[in-house]
């Protein structure tokens, strides 16, 4: 049977017969007739990323405030940095204290830093 003869035979089939043919081919050859999803174009990827819910956040120390020592202590607790490293980070504000963390962890860090007197932003 040639390809043209097969095409003619397929054209003469009903929708139910075509469905049965597809199922038989899938079973016989161990394949799936699922439609492959093409990757979106570069412009579409940016739009899709904007629609997706953000899952990673950065905690940014914007301003130390009046109580610098308490903010340094809070930074040390959150980051496990040494005293000098935490002090340098606080003095370099605005600075990311935690990066790529979950929403819950970012909120907890923000509360701890604000309780110490700092101004914090989550991005």
Curated annotation (Swiss-Prot):
Keyword Methyltransferase: no
Gene Ontology cellular component list: cytosolic large ribosomal subunit
InterPro entries noted in UniProt: Ribosomal_bL12 (IPR000206), Ribosomal_bL12_C (IPR013823), Ribosomal_bL12_C/ClpS-like (IPR014719), Ribosomal_bL12_oligo (IPR008932), Ribosomal_bL12_oligo_N_sf (IPR036235)
CDD domains on file: Ribosomal_L7_L12
Molecular function (Gene Ontology), one example: structural constituent of ribosome
Keywords: Ribonucleoprotein, Ribosomal protein
SUPFAM superfamilies the UniProt entry points to: ClpS-like (SSF54736), Ribosomal protein L7/12, oligomerisation (N-terminal) domain (SSF48300)
Gene3D superfamilies, per database record: 3.30.1390.10, Single helix bin (1.20.5.710)
One GO term (biological process): translation
Function, in words: Forms part of the ribosomal stalk which helps the ribosome interact with GTP-bound translation factors. Is thus essential for accurate translation.
Family: Belongs to the bacterial ribosomal protein bL12 family.
Description of how the protein assembles with itself and partners: Homodimer. Part of the ribosomal stalk of the 50S ribosomal subunit. Forms a multimeric L10(L12)X complex, where L10 forms an elongated spine to which 2 to 4 L12 dimers bind in a sequential fashion. Binds GTP-bound translation factors.
Name under which the protein is recorded: Large ribosomal subunit protein bL12
Organism: Dehalococcoides mccartyi (strain ATCC BAA-2100 / JCM 16839 / KCTC 5957 / BAV1)
